[in-house]
């Protein structure tokens, strides 16, 4: 299975599809419900949620532009008693789940009576901005002031909240209603002089919104993703040779969504077409459309995710193909034949939870049994490699701690594990089977570790756009290793005098840097201090960068229970790895356990970088 893959589900708020499940819930009940959705995503090894925060020209945050959403309290404009968007982002990030805020640009209401809107609603204050169609109210996409207002309303959330992405779905101009005409002739007469027909003008109105949102989002937050989930068919090949071998509704013509253009122009970071049909469906075959969209994104920087119809699987009234538990999982197997497909989004959360006919359980068993990293995007450099500071067997597994490398704080970390000795296979870190956990913290307990056996752990760091660092040095945990700690030269347990310099020159260093000093005929030792939990035997290992100009006989001092022992190490060779000084009997307590002395007759810098102490 892929190591990098977006795994997401839509959490819809309009008409209380997913969250909140009903209006009028208490703050604590609403929050508990949302946490349960995140917990479900985490249980399924998903790494993102797409949450509807502006369903009907309203807001799930205290917006200066639009009223509080009626789907929170039952009454539009009523304060729910907390900031839902701030709460949701915080809870998602605490689980290392990305939060993509989902906005519907033009829909105002699921009715056509403006008097039912709160009196301060912009659509009520500006009647010329709206039109009724098909029993609903919409903002008119052809009015420039409307477009600017919608963009401002969305950008308020972008600039004020730590969201990871902005998401638009398939609702642009309304879907056609038989016998009705969109009442925008006056706007076309006023603003459409440069276009030969109203249809090209309408498409341009949507194009302007998409292009301008792309520009504004990335000006405010260059790392934030902007994506659209359009209807799955752009155009049929029978209409346009660039179209797909399908015979369904054409979103280019029906709702004026030129989604292919957005990809080819690079106006979106990702496209997530809603390919809501089964494999073999005559009018719109899943395999045909997945291949077509793969061709569209090929050669661009736009990522392709697939919108999946979890709501169809096992549902009453659906085609027989959807009554087969393997329909959805077969979609993801088909995706693997297209390297352009980098993940999936499932509609919607309640259907993921329902797991009708076991379809979701089958899919997660086949494809989501291990965690996955979100696909990287952009060209930012990866963070520096972190360093593992401790790896200790505890009653419920192995407890790990680490620290960042370099000056830039990573957004998240990935933990890898190999059974037995350190990894030698160069493909180890590309293999999803070795990825154990992702987290935004700097500690993790591996509860899957057996009580016996040897494991080696590694940690990598990710930036905001998911570029991954080189791995940390491997940390070995053995059956008897009830205590193991690393003291790096940047840790609080390290001390050295002013004659010790700091360098990050060598790539063989442990962590961000190392210490160096000239040899002298006095000790002036650098010391590594830690708390030794109990008296007994310990293995002492040292890490240093090697260089032909470094010292050939650097004195390392071990403070054993019987007194100091000196072990001389040739630091010209065998650098960039753990090197054992031997096993020693240590006393319990907190003290300077290992030192690096400057007192040597040989020339070349003596190096103090990191020490590892493991109980035998």
Task: Go through each PLM region and give its residues.
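Substrate-binding cleft of secreted/luminal carbohydrate-active enzymes
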Residues: 256-260, 264-282, 296-380
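Glycoside hydrolase catalytic-domain groove-lining segments
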Residues: 193-242, 246-317
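Active-site-adjacent "subsite" loops/lids of carbohydrate-active enzymes
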Residues: 12-32, 101, 106-160, 253-257
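Beta-strand-rich modules
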Residues: 446-468
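Catalytic domains of carbohydrate-active enzymes, especially glycoside hydrolases
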Residues: 32-58
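Recognizes extended acidic, P/S/T-rich segments that occur
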Residues: 412-452
């Amino acid at each position: 299975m892929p190591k990098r893959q977006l795994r997401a589900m839509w959490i819809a708020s309009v008409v209380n599809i997913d969250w909140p499940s009903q209006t009028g819930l208490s703050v604590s009940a609403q929050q508990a419900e949302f946490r349960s959705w995140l917990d479900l995503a985490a249980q399924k090894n998903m790494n993102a949620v797409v949450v509807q925060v502006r369903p009907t020209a309203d807001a799930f945050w205290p917006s200066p532009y639009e009223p509080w959403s009626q789907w929170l309290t039952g009454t539009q404009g009523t304060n729910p008693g907390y900031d839902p968007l701030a709460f949701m982002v915080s809870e998602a990030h605490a689980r290392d789940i990305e939060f993509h805020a989902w906005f519907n640009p033009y829909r105002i209401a699921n009715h056509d009576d403006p008097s039912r809107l709160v009196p301060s609603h912009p659509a009520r204050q500006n009647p010329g901005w709206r039109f009724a169609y098909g029993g609903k109210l919409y903002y008119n996409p052809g009015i420039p002031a409307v477009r600017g207002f919608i963009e401002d309303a969305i950008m308020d959330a972008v600039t004020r909240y730590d969201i990871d992405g902005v998401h638009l779905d398939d609702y642009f101009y309304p879907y056609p209603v038989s016998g009705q005409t969109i009442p925008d002739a006056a706007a076309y007469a006023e603003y459409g002089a440069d276009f030969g027909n109203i249809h090209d003008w309408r498409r341009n109105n949507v194009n302007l919104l998409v292009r301008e949102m792309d520009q504004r989002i990335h000006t405010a937050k260059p790392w934030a993703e902007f994506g659209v989930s359009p209807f799955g068919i752009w155009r049929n090949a029978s209409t346009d040779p660039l179209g797909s071998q399908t015979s369904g509704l054409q979103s280019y013509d029906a709702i004026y969504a030129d989604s292919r253009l957005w990809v080819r122009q690079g106006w979106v970071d990702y496209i997530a077409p809603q390919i809501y049909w089964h494999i073999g469906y005559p009018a719109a075959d899943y395999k045909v459309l997945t291949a077509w969209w793969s061709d569209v994104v090929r050669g661009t920087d736009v990522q392709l995710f697939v919108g999946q119809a979890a709501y169809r699987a096992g549902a009453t009234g659906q085609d027989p193909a959807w009554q087969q538990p393997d329909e959805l999982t077969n979609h993801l197997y088909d995706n693997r034949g297209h390297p352009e497909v980098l993940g999936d989004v499932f509609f919607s959360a309640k259907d993921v939870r329902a797991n009708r006919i076991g379809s979701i359980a089958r899919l997660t068993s086949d494809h989501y049994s291990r965690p996955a990293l979100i696909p990287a995007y952009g060209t930012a450099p990866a963070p520096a490699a972190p360093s593992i500071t401790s790896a200790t067997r505890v009653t419920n597994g192995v407890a790990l701690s680490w620290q960042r490398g370099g000056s830039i704080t990573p957004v998240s970390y990935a933990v890898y594990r190999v059974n037995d000795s350190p990894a030698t296979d160069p493909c180890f870190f590309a293999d999803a089977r070795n990825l154990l956990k992702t987290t935004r913290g700097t500690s993790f307990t591996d509860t899957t570790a057996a009580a016996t056996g040897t494991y080696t752990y590694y940690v990598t760091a990710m930036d905001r756009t998911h570029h991954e660092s080189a791995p940390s040095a491997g940390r070995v945990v053995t059956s008897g290793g009830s205590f193991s700690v690393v003291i790096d030269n940047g840790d609080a347990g390290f001390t050295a005098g002013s004659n010790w310099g700091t360098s990050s020159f060598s790539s063989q260093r442990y962590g961000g840097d190392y210490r160096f000093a000239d040899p002298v005929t006095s000790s002036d030792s650098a010391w590594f201090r830690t708390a030794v939990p109990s008296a007994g035997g310990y293995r002492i290992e040292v890490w240093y960068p090697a260089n032909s100009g470094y010292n050939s006989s650097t004195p390392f001092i071990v403070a054993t229970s019987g007194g100091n022992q000196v072990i001389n190490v040739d630091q010209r060779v065998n650098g960039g790895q753990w090197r054992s000084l031997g096993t020693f009997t240590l006393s319990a307590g907190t003290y300077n356990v290992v030192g690096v002395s400057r007192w040597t007759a040989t020339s070349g810098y003596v190096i103090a970088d990191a020490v590892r102490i493991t109980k035998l």
